[in-house]
């Protein structure tokens, strides 16, 4: 009886051997993947070997060969200079650990921007080879580098810091700077570069957490009627930034810090409070260079986010890579592949949004430039000179692909008469038409030529009555107009782009319209009117906005044609500008407006 109990309770020799072998294997695997490459290497001088630098980086990342995407950004920066700080190495740092070594990482500050280097475990003489790019409006600029010792549980210990003044453009070369501590030096290579206007950040390698929605911010204050979410309470992001996805996961450092990942249209954020050690990572989507499948400890599927060169870490020391970029690795997802696709989709949507905004900014800049030159008198449309040898290609004023036909009929006037009578600078037709619609605060700029477009352009502003229940009583509207008359004066094209400002989703769309008149005989022409809605960004109510805008413009066309015919009739009776068949001057019938 006793012998049977002993056999049941005590393990056999074979079970002991299996347990010991498994323990040794797990310990060896942990040290192999967690501490491979972390040694106490000596730095003798400035010109250290780059191959040694690569060997000292934390490279325990078993990447899947199926790399998911290589992401590039091309946003714009308005900074005058870019200061590139290359953190090369440090030596003779204070030993903060019991074994006389440290786990150093650096925090680099320039103005209000803060970036984290990777952590080099178990070394008083770390090598980094990492670059940090900071935009600045002017020189001199102050660069502060503080070396910390990473602690798994407690707050990091400061090992020393140094502040460098960047006085002028140019590169300093590798220079050792003494820290404000009993021992320790850091080697930096600083290069200040003057940027051309609107230099792409793909060149500067810098997107940053603070650069957000320039076009939206310029529209005025945003009122958000909702409770602050985790992005506001934890990460102090803007009130209108909301969580699109959130995932339970863990951040890999010395071990896995479990927390939660939040994904918005602009950032990937992570928060952990293990051992009451607050860890907050805020990665701007514009700083992401690659998103890869990876593994943690061979058996735990993970996702590695690699940041572009010069971006640096955000909030927590990242992991290093041999090419100088830094990365964050997240593991312990419920569904790694599902999360990976969501992150990839968020980054793609971000860059697509930037491309759309960049095109719209360029288009708006062209219109603003075209409207900045003022002229006077009637519309002066010159016949094009003989440029067969050097053909000129003008830009399209509107998006033709969004237009739909709403009116086609015979109009009792010639294209030249419409240009000289209705659209001339001294004409009061636009004032009468806007008065008939009860619009107010009308301001009409004179016609002038524009290098970007054929013919002439002008800008008008007014406040328009809103009939939609979703809109306020009235809204400010900016309308850009473009007109061109063919050399034989038989075809007139009149195009408009309307931008409402105060309606819901007003910044998301524009109303494009084209009037085309082709001479039929000496007193009439065939008129074709097309209208459409161009969406600069996707929005939920796209179809409803499009249908409402087209219906509203159909009503406008009735009033515009009625006022136009009345104005032409009164003008023909009081001037000798041209003979108009008065019997043909009748109001447009609603049946013609489809």
Curated annotation (Swiss-Prot):
Superkingdom of the source species: Eukaryota
Gene3D superfamilies found in the cross-reference section: C2 domain, Pleckstrin-homology domain (PH domain)/Phosphotyrosine-binding domain (PTB)
Stored Pfam families: C2, GRAM, VASt
Occurrences of domain VASt (ranges): 399-572
Keywords tagged on the record: Membrane, Transmembrane, Transmembrane helix
Domain GRAM: 231-295
Coiled-coil blocks: none
Xref: PROSITE patterns: C2, VAST
Stretches assigned to the C2 domain: 67-179
Start-end of Polar residues biased regions: 584-594
Membrane topology: Single-pass membrane protein
Gene Ontology terms: cellular component: membrane
Disruption phenotype: Enhanced susceptibility to B.cinerea and permissive fungal growth.
A Gene Ontology BP annotation from the UniProt entry: defense response to fungus
Main location: membrane
The UniProt record lists the keyword Membrane: yes
Region called Disordered, residue ranges: 571-594
Subcellular location: Membrane
InterPro entries assigned to the protein according to its UniProt record, in alphabetical order: BAGP1-like, C2_dom, C2_domain_sf, GRAM, PH-like_dom_sf, VASt
Induction info: Up-regulated by cold, drought, salinity, abscisic acid and fungal infection.
Membrane-spanning residues: 8-28
Role according to the record: Involved in proteolytic processing of BAG6.
Complexes and interactors: Interacts with BAG6 and APCB1.
Protein name: BAG-associated GRAM protein 1
